[in-house]
C-alpha cells in the first residue's frame, strides 16, 4: 500500500477495523500479513480476537509473527490466549451496545461487512436496532465453532437472537436472518434448560423484561423438577423472577414452578401460590409513581396519567417519600420524573434502578428545554428510559409514555391478558389442589380466592369454587355456602354441589344458619335446587335428622 492510502485507512480509526478483520481469513498469506500490519496501526482492541484467531490457525510463520506483534502493540493477550473467550468477550460488548462499537451513533442504519474473494469487501445496510445483535451473534457463533461446549457463549447467542426478534422494527426483513429460518424460541428450547436459565439470569440482571418473559417460556418447555430452581453459578434465576418488579414475569415464573409440582421445598416456594392467587383477581389496571418538585407539577402529570387509565400513587418529592406506597402496591408499571433539576435526574434514575420494587419499571423523564438534549443523549440507547420536554402537548407525552411501556415491558396488561393469566393460574391452583401438593399448598390462597369468588362470574367463579371445595378450612366452606345462597337457578345448584364436595371431603364446617337454609330449600325449593340441597344435607351427616319430618310432611300431601 502507498503511504497515502495507508494514512487514509488509519485515519478512519475504528471504522476501518471491522472491514479489515472481516477480510483476514479469506485473503492470501501475503495479503494477511499486509492487513495485519495495517490493523496494528489502528489503536482499537476490537481487532484482537481476529488477530489471535489468525495467529492460532495460520500455518505461515511470518503471518503468525505479524499477528503477535500487532496484538502486543494493541495491548492484547499473549500467544496461546483463549481465542473463543476473546470472541465471546467482544460479542458481549456488542450485546451491551457499547458506544465505541457503534459507527454511526444516532443514525437509522449501520454497516455490516462481508468478504468475497472474487469481489472483495461487501457492505450492506442494517437497521440500527438489530445491528448489535447481528454482530453479537456472528462473534458468538465463531466462539462456539472454536469451543462448542461453552454454555455461556451459547446463552449469549440465544439472548442475542431473542433480542434481535424483540428489537426488529415492524415489517423489516433482517439481511442477516433469512425469512425462512427458525424463530428464536426454537433455538432457545433446543439449547436446554441450563442455557435458558442463563438467559433468564442475564435478563434479570439487566432489567430486560421482554427477554425475561421469553426465557421463562423456553425454560417451562424444557426444565422439570429441581432443574427449575437449580443453582446456576450462584444464581437461581427462575426463583429471582418471582420477585422481579414486573407482574407478567412474576406470573410466568409462578406458573412454570407450579406446573413442575415440586415435592421438596425450595427457597422462594412460599411465594408461588400467593402470586397465582393474586393473578386471579388481578385487573388490567396500571400503577404509576410520580416524583415532582411541587404539587402543581404532580397534579398536572397525575391528570394525564389518570386519563390514560393509570392509578397514580400519592404525591412525593422523592422516591424515599413514596417508599411506603410502593411497598403496598402489587407492582409499579411506570415511574415519572417531572421537572427535576437537571443534575438530579441521573441520580434519581440510578436510585430507581437500585430499588428492588421499581428496578425494572420504565422511567419517563419530563424535563426543561435547557437540559433536554443532554439527558436525551445520555439515555438514547436505554429502552427503559424516555426523555421528553415537559412543555409538550399532553397527547404527545401520552403517546411517548405508551411507546415507552410497549418497548420496556411489553405494553399495558390488557383485559384479555389479565383474564388469561387468571384462567391459567386457576388451572394451576386446581392441579395443585387435586394432587394435594404439600410444598405449594393451595390453602395459602384462601383469602384471595374467597375475595375472587365475590368478584368473578360464570365459569371462572365455578372454577374458584372448585378449588375452595378442596381446601379444608371452615371459611372456605362457609364462603361457598354464602355464595350459593346469594345466587339462584343453575349457579346456585352448581355452587351447592361444590359445598357438598367440600363436606364429603372434610365434614360439615357450616354454621346453624346454613343448615336451616338448606333444610328450607329441601322443603320448598324448586326441584333442581331441592335435589342439590338434599344431597348436601345428606353429606353434612347431621345428628338431628332433618329428613324424617320432611317424609312425614310429604306423606300428608
PLM regions and their residue ranges:
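Output/docking surface of receiver
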Residues: 317, 366-406
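TPR alpha-solenoid repeat register
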Residues: 152-153
Amino acid at each position: 500500500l502507498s503511504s497515502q492510502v495507508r494514512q487514509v485507512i488509519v485515519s478512519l480509526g475504528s471504522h476501518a477495523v471491522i472491514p479489515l478483520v472481516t477480510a483476514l481469513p479469506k485473503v492470501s498469506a501475503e495479503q494477511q500479513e499486509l492487513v495485519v500490519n495495517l490493523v496494528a496501526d489502528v489503536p482499537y482492541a476490537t481487532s484482537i480476537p481476529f488477530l489471535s484467531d489468525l495467529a492460532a490457525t495460520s500455518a505461515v510463520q511470518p503471518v503468525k509473527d505479524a499477528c503477535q506483534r500487532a496484538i502486543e502493540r494493541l495491548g492484547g493477550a499473549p500467544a496461546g490466549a483463549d481465542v473463543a473467550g476473546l470472541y465471546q468477550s467482544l460479542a458481549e460488548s456488542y450485546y451491551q451496545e457499547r458506544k465505541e462499537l457503534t459507527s454511526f451513533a444516532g443514525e437509522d442504519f449501520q454497516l455490516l461487512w462481508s468478504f468475497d474473494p472474487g469481489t472483495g469487501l461487501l457492505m450492506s445496510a442494517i437497521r440500527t436496532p438489530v445491528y448489535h445483535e447481528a454482530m453479537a451473534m456472528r462473534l458468538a457463533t465463531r466462539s462456539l465453532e472454536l469451543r462448542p461446549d461453552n454454555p455461556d457463549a451459547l446463552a449469549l447467542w440465544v439472548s442475542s437472537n431473542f433480542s434481535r426478534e424483540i428489537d426488529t422494527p415492524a415489517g423489516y426483513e433482517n439481511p442477516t436472518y433469512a425469512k425462512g429460518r427458525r424463530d428464536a424460541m426454537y433455538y432457545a428450547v433446543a439449547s436446554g434448560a441450563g442455557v435458558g436459565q442463563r438467559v433468564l439470569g442475564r435478563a434479570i440482571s439487566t432489567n430486560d423484561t421482554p427477554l425475561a418473559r421469553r426465557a421463562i417460556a423456553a425454560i417451562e418447555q424444557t426444565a422439570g423438577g429441581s432443574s427449575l430452581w437449580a443453582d446456576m453459578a450462584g444464581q437461581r434465576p427462575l426463583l429471582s423472577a418471582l420477585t422481579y418488579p414486573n407482574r407478567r414475569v412474576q406470573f410466568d415464573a409462578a406458573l412454570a414452578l407450579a406446573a413442575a409440582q415440586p415435592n421438596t421445598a425450595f427457597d422462594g416456594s412460599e411465594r408461588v401460590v400467593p402470586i397465582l392467587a393474586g393473578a386471579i383477581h388481578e385487573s388490567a389496571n396500571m400503577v404509576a409513581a410520580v416524583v415532582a418538585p411541587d404539587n402543581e407539577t404532580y397534579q398536572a402529570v397525575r391528570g394525564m396519567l389518570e386519563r390514560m387509565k393509570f392509578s397514580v400513587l400519592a404525591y412525593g418529592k422523592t422516591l424515599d417519600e413514596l417508599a411506603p406506597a410502593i411497598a403496598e402496591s402489587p407492582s409499579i408499571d411506570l415511574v415519572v420524573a417531572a421537572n427535576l433539576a437537571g443534575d438530579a435526574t441521573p441520580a434519581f434514575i440510578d436510585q430507581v434502578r437500585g430499588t428492588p420494587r421499581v428496578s425494572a419499571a420504565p422511567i419517563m423523564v419530563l424535563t426543561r428545554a435547557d437540559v433536554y438534549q443532554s439527558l436525551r443523549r445520555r439515555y438514547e440507547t436505554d429502552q427503559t428510559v424516555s426523555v421528553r420536554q415537559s412543555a409538550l402537548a399532553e397527547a404527545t407525552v401520552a403517546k411517548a409514555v405508551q411507546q415507552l411501556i410497549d418497548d420496556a415491558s411489553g405494553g399495558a396488561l390488557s383485559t384479555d391478558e389479565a383474564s388469561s393469566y387468571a384462567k391459567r393460574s386457576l388451572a394451576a391452583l386446581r392441579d395443585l389442589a387435586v394432587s394435594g401438593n404439600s410444598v405449594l399448598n393451595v390453602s395459602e390462597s384462601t383469602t384471595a380466592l374467597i375475595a375472587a369468588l365475590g368478584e368473578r362470574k360464570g365459569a371462572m367463579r365455578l372454577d374458584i369454587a372448585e378449588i375452595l371445595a378442596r381446601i379444608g378450612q371452615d371459611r372456605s366452606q362457609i364462603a361457598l355456602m354464602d355464595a350459593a345462597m346469594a345466587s339462584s337457578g343453575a349457579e346456585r345448584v352448581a355452587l351447592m354441589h361444590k359445598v357438598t364436595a367440600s363436606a364429603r371431603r372434610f365434614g360439615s364446617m357450616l354454621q346453624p344458619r346454613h343448615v336451616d337454609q338448606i333444610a328450607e330449600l329441601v322443603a320448598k325449593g324448586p326441584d333442581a335446587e331441592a335435589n342439590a340441597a338434599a344431597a348436601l344435607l345428606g353429606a353434612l351427616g347431621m345428628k338431628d335428622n332433618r329428613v324424617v319430618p320432611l317424609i312425614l310432611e310429604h306423606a300428608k300431601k
